[in-house]
């Protein structure tokens, strides 16, 4: 699926619809998407994984090194930081510690898309402040609080610092 912005700066989204995991259709679709991107010399700046966490391995194996932002919006995305950073060492990662859910993923994606369409830099502090205001109480707040923005993602920050330090010692 290809989605194009109709207003503001051009934003293109390439997505794979949920397909039968047991028949391997999702992997086939991912392979076709990779071929399409390569054929058209497209290098995604953002990679988003949504859906069940048992698919995240396939997403990470196909992660384009050009990804500057990686969103792991499935359950327990936080546990995949090291794998993401092996391919995209400078990526800004949003990940869920526990349950990933559409009611949180969609506002995050909309906030990022809105910034890009307006030609703005993605600045996490104001984005996260606005998102926090959307989930002031209840279950939605609890679920939102399980998402870790890049500037608070201590696991990713530690891995990046460790990798840099080890590289400087060689």
Model-derived regions, located:
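Functional beta-strand-loop-alpha-helix junction segments that form "active/interaction loops"
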Residues: 1-37
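Context-gated lysine
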Residues: 4-9, 23, 38-39, 68, ...
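Acidic-enriched, low-complexity/disordered segments with a strong bias for Aspartate over Glutamate
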Residues: 20-22, 26, 82-83, 90, ...
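Catalytic cores of nucleophile-dependent amide-cleaving enzymes
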Residues: 36-119
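Caspase-like cysteine protease fold
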Residues: 124-170
């Amino acid at each position: 699926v290809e989605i194009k912005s109709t207003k503001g700066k051009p934003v293109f989204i390439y997505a794979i619809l949920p397909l039968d995991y047991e028949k391997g259709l999702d992997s086939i679709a991912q392979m076709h998407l990779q071929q399409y991107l390569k054929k058209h010399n497209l290098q995604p700046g953002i990679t988003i994984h949504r859906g069940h966490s048992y698919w995240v391995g396939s997403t990470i194996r196909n992660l384009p090194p050009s990804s500057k932002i990686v969103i792991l919006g499935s359950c327990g995305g936080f546990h995949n930081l090291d794998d993401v950073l092996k391919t995209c060492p400078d990526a800004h990662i949003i990940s869920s510690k526990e349950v990933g859910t559409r009611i949180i993923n969609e506002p995050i994606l909309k906030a990022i898309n809105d910034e890009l369409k307006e030609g703005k830099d993605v600045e996490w502090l104001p984005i996260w402040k606005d998102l926090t205001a959307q989930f002031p109480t209840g279950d939605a707040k609890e679920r939102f609080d399980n998402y870790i923005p890049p500037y608070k993602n201590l696991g990713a920050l530690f891995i990046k610092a460790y990798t840099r330090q080890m590289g400087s010692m060689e």
